[in-house]
Amino acid sequence: MVIIWWFWSLLAICASDSFRDQAVAIMRTTPVIDGHNDLPWQLLNLFNNQLLRPDADLNKLAQTHTNIPKLKAGFVGGQFWSAYMPCDTQNKDAVKRILEQMDVIHRMCQLYPETFMCVTNSSDILQAFRRGKVASLIGVEGGHLIDSSLGVLRTLYHLGMRYLTLTHNCNTPWADNWLVDRGDDEAESHGLSPFGKRLLNEMNRLGVMIDLSHVSVATMKDALQISRAPVIFSHSSAYSLCPHRRNVPDDVLQLVKNTSSLVMVNFFSNFVSCSDSATLPQVADHLDHIKKVAGAGAVGLGGDYDGVTMLPVGLEDVSKYPDLIAELLRRNWTETEVRGLLADNLIRVFSEVELVSNNMQSPEEVPITLKELDGSCRTYYGYSQAHSIHLQTGALVASLASLLFRLHLL
């Protein structure tokens, strides 16, 4: 009896190794493109973006989910690095701070040219693959970071931004965030405001992917209806398996299918199992569910490494992707489906976004209205209403001064 148990255990181990070997073989030619990694945020918190410090060496950095050896072990060939600053920068120094975070991503590429290749288009991702480098792209996480400015949007595009997450954990003057659905924030735009819709049109024209992670369901539906190009969820999971408001409900997944869009599954335990603990097979369940509802072309990976504190057992850092792929092969995912998940689906969406951009010419020029803006530190140059108010206030002050002068003479 013991011999039989040993024999079957040995067969199981061999089968497991076989699936992992198959995963590695696939990933050697189609490496992972992950949709969301917060290493730049960790570089700010740990080193104040001083990359030349000896303890900031990405070949040796031990306290993060991400470093160069782990990326190589995980067969990561493309990464959207998150340029992120929290919502408390809104109406303050958001634009300055996001420029600094984009700068640190560019400096990563300059400091480690043998590992990272900063790219800005879909064809260059494939070129980076061929050179054995990590194609490094910039995703700006939070619409508050453009300060409701079409000009800032365009400038960040020219500096390398290739997706914009419309909100983080706060509303912008033009889009509602996911906390509205939980009842923690009030709906202000009830999805997208008229300016928000114009801003999405400008994103389409530029070739900036629209990222709907962190937004309210109403914002999701507005964007999926309005966008001329497919959209992405850079780091979200399936609401049906874990009813957290950061996840994507099935009716939205159907819209994702109808628009050839993409959901890149988040590994944060609270979004996977709705608890502090989760497992690798539970992440595979989310991938299975999205594939079932939206199709194999609609699923990708957006682990949220270095942006979360709790990760599933078996997916503790970026080196673990082959184990997840082995689990999917064990579940009878085809090689074509696996390659789609790893990279091909994202490259398709990115290419379609670029194609839409090539067919759009005229930029959006009408700015957000003055009454939609907030913040006591603002100036209002260019707004005729503000100019009118300024003239009226100036005339009132002059009249009062004249009256006081006459009273003084009396």
Swiss-Prot record:
Propeptide: 385-410
Pfam families: Peptidase_M19 (PF01244)
Transmembrane segments: none
Binding site for substrate: 168, 246, 304
Knockout consequences: Deficient mice are phenotypically normal. However deficient mice display a partial loss in the conversion of leukotriene D4 to leukotrience E4 and in the conversion of cys-bis-gly to cysteine and glycine. Deficient mice display reduces mortality in models of sepsis.
Residue positions bearing lipid (GPI-anchor amidated serine): 384
Subcellular location: Apical cell membrane; Cell projection, Microvillus membrane
GO molecular function, one term: beta-lactamase activity
Membrane topology designation: Lipid-anchor; GPI-anchor
Sites carrying sugar chains: 121, 258, 332
E.C. numbers: 3.4.13.19, 3.5.2.6
Requisite cofactors: Zn(2+)
UniProt signal peptide: 1-16
Ways its activity is controlled: Inhibited by L-penicillamine. Inhibited by cilastatin.
Binding, Zn(2+) 2: 141, 214, 235
BP terms from Gene Ontology: antibiotic metabolic process; cellular response to calcium ion; cellular response to nitric oxide; glutathione catabolic process; homocysteine metabolic process; inflammatory response; leukotriene D4 catabolic process; leukotriene metabolic process
Main location: membrane
Cellular component annotations (GO), alphabetically ordered: apical part of cell; apical plasma membrane; cell junction; extracellular space; microvillus membrane; nucleoplasm; plasma membrane; side of membrane
Residues that hold Zn(2+) 1 according to the record: 36, 38, 141
Keyword terms, alphabetized: Cell membrane, Cell projection, Dipeptidase, Disulfide bond, Glycoprotein, GPI-anchor, Hydrolase, Lipid metabolism, Lipoprotein, Membrane, Metal-binding, Metalloprotease, Protease, Signal, Zinc
Tissues and organs where the protein is expressed, per its UniProt entry: Expressed in heart, lung, skeletal muscle, kidney, liver, and testis. Not detected in brain and spleen.
Function (record text): Hydrolyzes a wide range of dipeptides including the conversion of leukotriene D4 to leukotriene E4. Hydrolyzes cystinyl-bis-glycine (cys-bis-gly) formed during glutathione degradation. Also possesses beta lactamase activity and hydrolytically inactivates beta-lactam antibiotics.
Homology family: Belongs to the metallo-dependent hydrolases superfamily. Peptidase M19 family.
Alphabetized PANTHER family for the sequence: DIPEPTIDASE 1, MICROSOMAL DIPEPTIDASE
Assembly and interaction partners: Homodimer; disulfide-linked.
Name this polypeptide is given: Dipeptidase 1
Upper taxonomic lineage: Eukaryota, Metazoa, Chordata, Craniata, Vertebrata
Gene from which the chain derives: Dpep1
